[in-house]
Each structure stands twice: as C-alpha cells, then as structure tokens.
C-alpha cells in the first residue's frame, strides 16, 4: 500500500505550520545532550505526525528526530524494511529559535528502505513543495486549509563566481575554501533545498542526518540535482542498502557517512570539490 497522498501531507503541514508559527516569536527552548536545540514546537509537531503515522499494528512506522531514540531495535528494523514516514518537525531549529525565517518542516516516505517521496513546508511563506508519483508540485496558501496546488518546474541557478553556496557548520568552520562564491551557513537543510529548487543558491556542502534530508532529497533528485562525495560517489535515495548512512546503534546513527556536494549537475559538484581542502570527511 502506498500511503503518500498530497491531501494528507498538506493537511498535516497546515496543522504543523500553525503550531510552529504559534511559538515562533518566543519558542520555549532546551538544549539536548548533543548540544542542539529543541523547542516545544518540535515536540508538538512530531506528536502530530506520530498520531497519523506511528501505527505498527498496521505495518506503518515513523522515524522522527525527537522520538527515534525511544524506539527499540525491532521497531527500527521494521521501519527500515517496510513502510515508514521520516519527519523533522522543525528543520533549522537554531534559526527558528532565533526568529530567522530559514527553517521548515520535512517529511519523507520510505518503502523497503528507499526514499520514494518527499515534501518540505515553509510556514513563514505559507508554501510547500512535494513529490508525487514522479512529479513535483508547489502548494501555496497551505495554512488556509484550501491550498493552491500546481505542477512545479525547478529553476536551478546557473553557475557564476557570484552564485551563493551553502555549507554545513563543520565544513565552514574547518575546511579551506577557495571558491570566490558567497558562502552561507544557515544550519538548515529545508531552507537550502527551497532555495536550490527556486534558483536562489547554486549549491550546498551537506553532512546531516536522515530526517534532515528525507523530505528534500527526493525533490532534488527528481529535479535533476547531483549529490556526490569527494570521490564522486553518489548519495542516492536507497537509505538501507546504499551504504551512505550509519544505521547501526551508536553515536553516529542516522548520520551521513560522508560529506556530499549538491549542485545542478555533476560538473558543478566537481567544481566545488576542486576548490576546497576538506578535513574530517566522515
């Protein structure tokens, strides 16, 4: 059974967006053991998605940033082998907590360990992008309850020395980066994916966890973007057998094994890799 439906996703995004915006001006904030922030909005939004998708009795599972550590190994194995939604309730919690509108909500859909569909929602702009059966759609007025949905044609940015490139925190802090492009460090995947799809930034140096990319990577792949490591290895949508994620129990679980560069084509990924001296690639 394929339980990915545009109406269902957008209805959940409407409720999730309302929660996020309700707390946006002054979100209750805590710092987790891994030194990353979590807000009350993160927890309430994940509970919303869990109520809809955490149904193991129906062979439907949820991997969520804020609750996955409570799952036992039997649940995780079933989720990775079967039908599973992957949610990041607020991707970009740091900018969200600071009142910077570079955050969003990420939802991916896996079957048999492969990401087959994805969606991202930008509540501040009241907009979402989602895949459905080989097409990309853009939804406006999501929070109205009567979204305007239409096919979307991505507009990747053409390369120029002025084209912005986004980078993961550790890359920006520790790598030698010699390209002339403006470098943005936004602490969000959804915010960057949105800008890649709309041609506002050229590329991205990415190193993140499964839930950070689960909503956006199916969109980027369908749009023709490349995501490759320093050795040219592709980051695909096969989470389990692709070998690109740490999936065993341990401190790195759910993280990409290697950094990748995302760009509109392979030439773009190689151009960025050729202008950095990377350290600690995994």
Regions found by a protein language model. Give the residues of each.
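N-terminal subdomain of lithium-sensitive/metallo-dependent phosphomonoesterases centered on the IMPase/IPPase/PAP
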Residues: 1-90, 274-282
């Amino acid at each position: 059974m394929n339980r990915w439906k545009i109406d269902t996703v957008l209805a959940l995004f409407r409720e999730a967006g309302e929660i996020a915006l309700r707390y946006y001006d002054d979100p209750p904030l805590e710092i987790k053991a891994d030194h990353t922030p979590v807000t009350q909005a993160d927890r309430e939004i994940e509970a919303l998605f869990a109520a809809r998708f955490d149904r193991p009795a129906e062979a439907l599972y949820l991997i969520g940033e804020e609750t996955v550590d409570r799952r036992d190994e039997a649940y995780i194995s079933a989720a990775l082998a079967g039908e599973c939604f992957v949610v990041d309730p607020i991707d970009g919690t740091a900018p969200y907590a600071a009142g910077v509108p570079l955050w969003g909500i990420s939802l991916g859909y896996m079957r048999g360990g492969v990401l087959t569909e994805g969606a991202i929602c930008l509540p501040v702009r009241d907009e979402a992008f989602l895949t459905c059966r080989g097409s990309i759609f853009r939804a406006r007025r999501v929070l109205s309850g009567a979204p305007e949905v239409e096919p979307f044609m991505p507009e990747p940015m053409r390369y120029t020395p002025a084209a912005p490139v986004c980078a993961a925190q550790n890359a920006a802090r520790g790598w030698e980066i010699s390209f002339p492009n403006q470098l943005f460090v936004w602490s969000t995947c959804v915010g960057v994916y949105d800008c890649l799809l709309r041609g506002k930034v050229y590329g991205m140096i990415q190193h993140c966890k499964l839930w950070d990319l689960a909503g956006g990577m199916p969109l980027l792949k369908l749009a023709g973007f490349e995501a490759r490591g320093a050795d040219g290895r592709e980051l695909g949508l096969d989470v389990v057998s692709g070998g690109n994620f740490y999936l065993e129990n341990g401190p790195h679980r759910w993280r990409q094994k290697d950094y990748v560069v995302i760009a509109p084509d392979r030439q773009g990924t190689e151009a960025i890799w050729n202008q950095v001296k990377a350290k600690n690639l995994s």
